[in-house]
From Swiss-Prot:
MF annotations from Gene Ontology: hydrolase activity
Pfam families per UniProt: M20_dimer, Peptidase_M20
Domain of life the protein comes from: Bacteria
InterPro entries named in the record: Amidohydrolase (IPR017439), Bact_exopeptidase_dim_dom (IPR036264), Peptidase_M20 (IPR002933), Peptidase_M20_dimer (IPR011650)
SUPFAM superfamilies xref list: Bacterial exopeptidase dimerisation domain, Zn-dependent exopeptidases
Coiled coil location: none
Organism listed in the record: Staphylococcus aureus (strain MRSA252)
The name this protein goes by in its record: Uncharacterized hydrolase SAR1410
Length: 383
């Protein structure tokens, strides 16, 4: 089959069989079977995900990453390759990322067989990007300890940019993403005896108000930060003083100092609840994703490789507010660079955003990505 047939076949198979973070068992088996067909050795440091390696002629080792997990979304696309999993969908394009890396593996294997693979290559089929921090899990598991990786590259499809556009930016390209949760515990009573209770309802209103003021009064208005409240609840019955409350949301920022400010303010809010309402309040933070930092030292190589792949380069003036665990590779492993590849095609109706039930794209864009990857490999220079 030709390369367009290859990416169409594999992407649509993966699209029909999406799996949630840390549950990508069939996807992992599919990738392993593909690698087995090429006689390529691989490791599985975690229950899901695959790390493959090909030795080249040069002394450098570079890595390419694709995330393989999907989202808990009911697909609404009316296409033959629609998701067959109930309320699970590749709504973030990871089926395309995985397929791209599979084709690149095949190209590299062909080069190796011909004695023409210029450098050593590590292929990262990573689980749990959406939730679970799969990149950090792999690093902590020692998945890359035996590889002297000098640089890590990755891409993400981007339906906000037209086909043929590659969006890049040095330094921060995505925000940090940190989840927070408030837990409130008061004392229940009948509403007729409300003075006997300690209401989590009023306490939760206070928390909501104070969180909404963090961005206005404690963060620099010239910076793009998000302190988002996603879900909250208090009590169970309409005639009872609620004895419990719960609130959760996400923080998006590019600046670690700003994140520290937000966390400190939230701890103060929790303390104030006890003083004002006699309600116990605790705030917890889930391990978040740091900002994705693109190494300026790799910029020239990235731009040249994109242009040679017939992609027009757009230098984004401000970072995206997406969170992305590719950030851990640049933070802990090696200099890294992350590129957004445009997939928007109005004629075909491919216009909806990431994490939506209608996300779709033309598989031909994936071949440009593989060309970009190969150009990077052929012209890699140590930084």
């Amino acid at each position: 089959m030709n390369e367009l047939e290859f990416v169409t076949k594999h992407r649509r198979h993966l699209h029909q069989h999406p799996e949630l973070s840390l549950h990508e068992f069939e996807t992992t088996a599919y990738i392993k079977a593909f690698l087995d067909s090429l006689n390529i050795k691989y490791d599985c440091p975690l229950e899901t995900g695959v790390i493959a390696y090909l030795e080249g002629n040069g002394s450098h080792t570079i890595a390419y990453r694709a995330d393989i997990d999907a989202l808990p979304i009911l697909e609404e696309n009316d296409v033959p390759y629609r998701s067959q999993s109930d309320h699970v969908m590749h709504a973030c394009g990871h089926d395309g990322h995985t397929t791209t890396l599979m084709l690149f593996v095949q190209r590299c294997k062909d080069m190796q067989d011909a004695g023409q693979l210029p450098q050593n290559v590590v292929f990262i089929f990573q689980p749990a990007e959406e939730t679970g921090g799969g990149a950090n899990r792999l690093i902590k598991a020692g998945a890359f300890d035996k590889y002297p990786i000098e640089a890590v590259f990755g891409i993400h499809v981007n339906p906000f940019a037209d086909e043929g556009i590659a969006v890049i930016r040095d330094e921060e390209i995505t925000a940090s993403a940190t989840e927070y949760r408030f837990f409130l515990t008061g004392l229940s009573s009948h509403v007729a005896d409300k003075e006997q209770g300690h209401s989590c309802g009023e306490a939760l209103q206070h928390v909501l108000t104070q969180i909404s003021q963090i961005q206005q009064f404690h963060l620099n208005g010239l910076k793009r930060n998000i302190v988002h409240i996603g879900h909250f609840k208090a009590g169970e019955a309409i005639n009872t003083v609620p004895s419990n409350g719960y609130l959760e949301g996400t923080i998006r920022t590019y600046d670690i100092d700003d994140l520290t400010i937000v966390k400190n303010q939230m701890h103060k809010i929790a303390e104030s609840v006890k003083l004002l309402f006699n309600v116990d309040c605790e705030v917890k933070f889930a391990e978040g994703y740091p900002p994705t930092i693109n190494s300026p030292k790799l910029r020239t190589q990235i731009e040249d490789a994109l242009i040679k792949a017939d992609l027009n380069v757009y230098d984004k003036p401000t970072p995206f507010l997406f969170g992305e665990d590719f950030s851990f590779y640049g933070q802990q492993l090696a200099p890294a660079y992350f590129v957004f590849i445009g997939t928007r095609n109005e004629d075909k109706g491919f216009v909806t955003g990431l994490h939506t039930s209608y996300l779709n794209f033309d598989e031909k864009v994936l071949i440009n990505v593989v060309n970009f990857y190969e150009n990077l490999l052929n012209n890699y220079k140590e930084v």
